[in-house]
Amino acid sequence: MKNYRGVTALLLFVLMAWMLPSHAKPTKTLRFEADTVRVLRNPLNGWVMYLNRNWDGDFWEKAGYDAMKTSDGSVVKVSDYASTAYLRTSWASLEPSEGEYVWRDKSSRYSRMLQSCLDRGLKLALRIVFDGRDQGQNTPMYVINAGAKYYEASNIKTPYMDDPVFQEKYAKFIEELAKDFNDPDKVDFIDAFSPGKWGEAHAVLYQDSRNKAAAFDWMTSLHARCFTKVPIFINYHRMIADSNQNSWSDVVPSDTEGLLLSAIEKGYSIRHDAFGMHDYYQDWEKEFARKWNFRLPILMEGGWITAAHHRYWIDSSGKYREGHSEDVRRGEYEASKEAHVNMMDLRINDEVASWFSLAFDLVKGFVAEGGYRLYPSEVSVPERVRRGADVR
């Protein structure tokens, strides 16, 4: 009863105030149109362009990024449409020998490449891969030589994620990396859980798969402790951290959601690396994204590699025609729209070329409609004010 009396009194006060004569000064209302054309490089907003681990600082011209043809007939710079430059590379390339941190060598190829991006106003993003299957020796050999237990295939040695020697060396590397990249002035985000094939956290190698939860907690806690000033991300897919070497199961492992929630509680946001792949981005993944819409940022990466070995035209959606990369771009765009992603990827090679040369309308569409833009829709101000007076 006490609460009802309080509400009644408040309503009477508001009504009386509304009935009082107004002595407000004349005001003028200004209305603003949203600028949906200009690329705004807000944090976690816009397009992400990918860097090749073999590039140097002059890749802009050599890779055609400064003279990219578009589907409307214009020629543009890719960097004018991107917010972030993303490097996915190996641990071995950044620390070839123990304590040799390549990015700190200003004369190194990596340092020149990253600096060229910063010079253009782009921020950086990183994913460090240590599983070498299908790629090469991604873990530095000093880790293997120190006694880390490993899985070997085609003479490529990948340490088990739950091996104590690996964990010791990897933790030291991440701590050193964070000293230079835990910096929001130059870094947009870090992919902070990257075991398994291609660093996508599936088909993960363990000495004992019963250590899955403990190893997951160790790696996510490490990154959360080291990267305190920049956003950190983890893949949301049903096989997260799982040892299933098929990288897929129609039945979602019972611990998947709990693992992801434990990472989110540590400050992680979420990304997915198979947008547009209808056989790998299914109802479970869509529903997980829906649960976190407008609560966490979501990053998108397309799954199909349209100019390489991927046969994207066999996608179960039936929407992709062989020889038509633009069909895949449109499929990725629609899936991203459904998930309300904050950032989309231009990626590299045929992906970036087809976004611009075959689907430039979608590139501009995401600039206009994706992410966020903060502006006043209208402002009311007094028509006349006295110099030095407060305006309320």
Task: Place the predicted regions along the sequence by residue.
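Active-site groove signature of glycoside hydrolases
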Residues: 151-166, 170-209
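Bacterial N-terminal signal peptides
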Residues: 9-18
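Soluble or luminal CAZymes and related metallo-dependent hydrolases
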Residues: 105, 109, 162-173, 211-215, ...
